[in-house]
Amino acid sequence: MPKKLKKQYEDKKMTRFSSYHCAYACDSAELPFHGDMVIEVPEQYRDVVPADYFLLREFSHEKSFAPEGKNILQTMTYCKEDEAKRFISLSRDKKAYKERKQKIATAIMEIIANKYPELNGKLDCLDVWTPATYRRFVNSEIGSWMSFALPPRTLPLMMKNKVKGLKNVILATQWLQAPGGLPIAASSGINAIKTILKREKRRSAG
């Protein structure tokens, strides 16, 4: 592992994170909100949803996402590294993991219905996915879909894509620059290609 990346892993200020999500079919053509909403988690639900807030998103602008007269809602709740690891550990017990997801889906559905009474009885859970889901699909250690959350007053540093002591190894990953994500991963891939082309050019010139 590059020294700078190892240093970030060891820096307590640099936080790794993941998230868990719920998707609901909404039996209503009209919604009481548009776009994204930040919803506070009431105290009585925080044993099941241990977060201050979650993001609620609607997709009415995507006409092909739901039949006419209906909508799709999706929630996203961020979680830190420890909680992400608990999800991954729990997923080894299929029954307990399924029950945990059902509790989350029910709690969040109730929170939404309390916030928007006009949606009460009109939501049906389609799916719940967690850090364990991301780990299963992309083999990310804690289900990270981005790298590190940047602390306040911190500038993201771009690390070199070469590892000292390893010949012909070029890294292309979101972890080379916080906060990661798809654009940085794509840029990292472009930089890896440029590095390879430079090396090949030197070899052909020599």
Predicted feature residues:
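A glycine-rich dinucleotide-binding beta-alpha-beta segment and adjacent secondary-structure elements
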Residues: N114, E118-A178
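Short coil-to-beta-strand
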Residues: G69-K80, G165-K167
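A generic secondary-structure signal for well-formed alpha-helical elements
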Residues: A29, E83, Y116, I196-E200
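Mid-domain catalytic core of redox enzymes
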Residues: M1-E68
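Short acidic/His/Gly/Ser-rich catalytic and metal-binding motifs that mark active-site loops
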Residues: D82-I88
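Acidic/polar loop patches that form or flank catalytic/metal-binding clefts of enzymes
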Residues: E30-M37, L119-L123, K201-A205
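A conserved FAD-binding loop/helix module that cradles the flavin
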Residues: L166, Q174-E200
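Flavin-binding catalytic cores
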Residues: E30, E68, I72-L73, D93-A132
